[in-house]
Swiss-Prot record:
Species for this entry: Nostoc sp. (strain PCC 7120 / SAG 25.82 / UTEX 2576)
A Pfam family of this chain: PsaM
SUPFAM superfamilies in the record: Subunit XII of photosystem I reaction centre, PsaM
UniProt topology in membrane: Single-pass membrane protein
Name by which UniProt lists this protein: Photosystem I reaction center subunit XII
Membrane-crossing segments per the record: 9-28
Location of the protein in the cell: Cellular thylakoid membrane
Entry keyword annotation includes Lyase: no
Alphabetized HAMAP family for the sequence: PSI_PsaM
GO cellular component terms, semicolon-separated: photosystem I; plasma membrane-derived thylakoid membrane
Keywords noted in UniProt: Membrane, Photosynthesis, Photosystem I, Thylakoid, Transmembrane, Transmembrane helix
One BP term from GO: photosynthesis
Family assignment from sequence similarity: Belongs to the PsaM family.
């Protein structure tokens, strides 16, 4: 196995961003 590839880095970023985006959308809906 080689070191972390660019694809794995992008996948990790997407996985980390999805919950943040969902939380942001929920917050904007609550504040309306």
């Amino acid at each position: 196995m080689s070191s972390i590839s660019d694809t794995q880095v992008y996948i990790a970023l997407v996985v980390a961003l999805i919950p943040g985006l969902l939380a942001w959308r929920l917050a904007t809906e609550l504040y309306k």
